[in-house]
Swiss-Prot record:
Record GO cellular component, one term: extracellular region
Keyword Hydrolase: yes
Localisation per UniProt entry: Secreted
Pfam families referenced in this protein's UniProt entry, alphabetically: Trypsin
GO biological process: proteolysis
Family classification: Belongs to the peptidase S1B family.
Signal peptide (UniProt feature, chain positions): 1-35
Statement: the UniProt record of this protein carries the keyword Secreted: yes
Group of enzyme by EC: hydrolase
Chief location of this protein within or outside the cell: secreted
Species this protein is from: Staphylococcus aureus
MF terms in GO: serine-type endopeptidase activity
Protein name: Serine protease SplA
Species classification: Bacteria, Bacillati, Bacillota, Bacilli, Bacillales
Gene: splA
InterPro entries assigned: Peptidase_S1_PA, Peptidase_S1_PA_chymotrypsin, Peptidase_S1B, Peptidase_S1B_tx, Trypsin_dom, V8_his_AS
Amino acid sequence: MNKNVMIKGLTALTILTSLGFAENISDQPHSIAKAEKNIKEVTDATKAPYNSVVAFAGGTGVVVGKNTIVTNKHIAKSNDIFKNRVSAHHSSKGKGGGNYDVKDIVEYPGKEDLAIVHVHETSTEGLNFNKNVSYTKFAEGAKMKDRISVIGYPKGAQTKYKMFESTGTINHINGTFMEFDAYAQPGNSGSPVLNSKNELVGILYAGSGKDESEKNFGVYFTPQLKEFIQNNIEK
């Protein structure tokens, strides 16, 4: 992999809060996209597709079934430093879906940066996970020039885990590798990449170190990867 490629998600080195992640964060505003105009904050994440997106301490994940989240291996591994907690569709103004402890992690056996995270059904606040999220459906496929959106938690600790959505275009697909130009930053690792129907095409895992808005990279969900995920959804 090009040395300019950086993993987006290993930056949340802070103390946990009641939300599950960081405290004593500055109240000063933070710029998420200095040059891009295709990114917006999602202030109310209580409806689909936003309520299928969850925050890890240093990244993002997407709900695909009962108690089942898809994210990156590097996010799932690093999250145990932060007490294995996941926050369901947290946003700045909308009602969040609760904070959930991780039950177990199933890593994809191949080279792809893909992992399944199962959470306990009841949150620390007594909420039911499956009643407070939606399940994102898989896309049948995707191709170059398809419009996509990326939803997640860029610079999560710095922004107090505000949710953001960016849009862009798929530039290249080769096997399980996908390149696109939707804006992303550290914290977007594991973010769902959705098509125009809000169906799941894949997840983001890395980006260009030269210019984060130039190009980003994702795990494209081939039939084989979708089968792996579906076989690991809790029954």
